[in-house]
Amino acid sequence: MKVRPSVKPMCEKCKVIRRKGKVMVICENPKHKQKQG
């Protein structure tokens, strides 16, 4: 899980979602998981 000021999809399988007001990226590749904060 990467914590970044700006989250961007890194591949075509990445999905940008919102959970509890936080923007997150979920993906098949665990290295691509990101959250904003």
Swiss-Prot record:
Keywords: Ribonucleoprotein, Ribosomal protein. InterPro entries: Ribosomal_bL36, Ribosomal_bL36_sp. GO terms for biological process: translation. The keyword Ribosomal protein applies. SUPFAM superfamilies: Ribosomal protein L36. PROSITE patterns: RIBOSOMAL_L36 (PS00828). The keyword Ribosomal protein applies. GO terms for cellular component: cytoplasm; ribonucleoprotein complex; ribosome. One of its GO terms (molecular function) is structural constituent of ribosome. HAMAP family: Ribosomal_bL36 (MF_00251). Belongs to the bacterial ribosomal protein bL36 family. This is Large ribosomal subunit protein bL36. The gene is rpmJ.
